[in-house]
Amino acid sequence: MVSLVKNDKKGFSVLGFVWFFVLLILLGNSLFSEGDTLYVGSNTVTLFGKYLCYALLAVSLDLIWGYLGILSLGHAAFFALGGYVMGMYLMRQIGTRGVYGNAELPDFMVFLNWHELPWYWYGVGHFPIALILIMLVPATLAFVFGFLAFKSRVGGVYLSIITQSLTFALALAFYRNETGFGGNNGLTDFKDILGFSITSNTTRDVLLICTAAALTIGYILCRIIVNSRLGRVVVAIRDSESRVRFIGYHVEYFKLFIFVFGAILAGIAGALYVPQVGIINPGEFNPINSIELVIWVAVGGRASLYGAIIGAILVNYSKTVFTGVFPDEWLYALGLLFVLVTLFLPKGVIGVIDIIKAKKADKGDGDKGTPVETKEAEHA
């Protein structure tokens, strides 16, 4: 198993940079006080944690789109489902500290004059159960959807449209107050997690470390998959599904496994996202979020995994910077960026880096060969 990841120098270099910045941020937040030049505020800790959640989400999509060849335009739905499960757990930890002081019901249910907790909220207040549901809920949806779609041999643009319809339908359902997930406002006003204040600097630091660890583990698992025999079959399905099917492989089972595994990673990313940003609402199901996710992967570079990390962090950092300067034009710029990358940089940022390295290597080989040719000419 070690042999499947030991040669991934580029990927581990990217992860090394991630951990380096995590360390710098944590040191700046803990060793220095507000007003110092090197002080890093809690907002920066939260912001970088959010970037890493997006990076894990992008890696999960790259596995599905880059290696399996399925362009899922509803992948953010799994992210949102994992986030909602974590939000439900955090809401159950509030107890009598809510506005209405009701230990049995969240505030929004009391406000809507509900008298009992819905059955699907049972047990979610226990962390081990919530942890299982964070993975199980997205996996179940992905399994049911994928089984029906892949068995029916739906593919290409039709599958992309169906995935987008799925996340749109979920958004409509979660916007309704009757579903018991907070309606438009979603779930918020969290107090603590595992008994620790969710707003304390220490908790934020630990959440950042947990997110970086989840990204690292998720990346390694994806790398093991794509470098294994399973991964080679998956890539073959992407390149020519009919040939793989003709050989005798049950293509739908391979597609289903990758689709479900990607959904689980997305759910974990969503669960780590919620306690750091302090809210989860139906807006996370917005199809635009899934389209933005595709752009992150495209900008970084498809079918590389580490390119998805670079793209997610790069695009979201740019979004943070430019939305303050050009708040109305940012979405247009993002769309233009996707078009330009698709037309001129099909391999994304990592493709540009590889081209630059190749040119430098060619130049170096040319320089080394010049003296030899000169000496041969002189002897001639």
Outline where the language-model segments fall.
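Transmembrane alpha-helices and adjacent helix-loop boundaries
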Residues: M1-A380
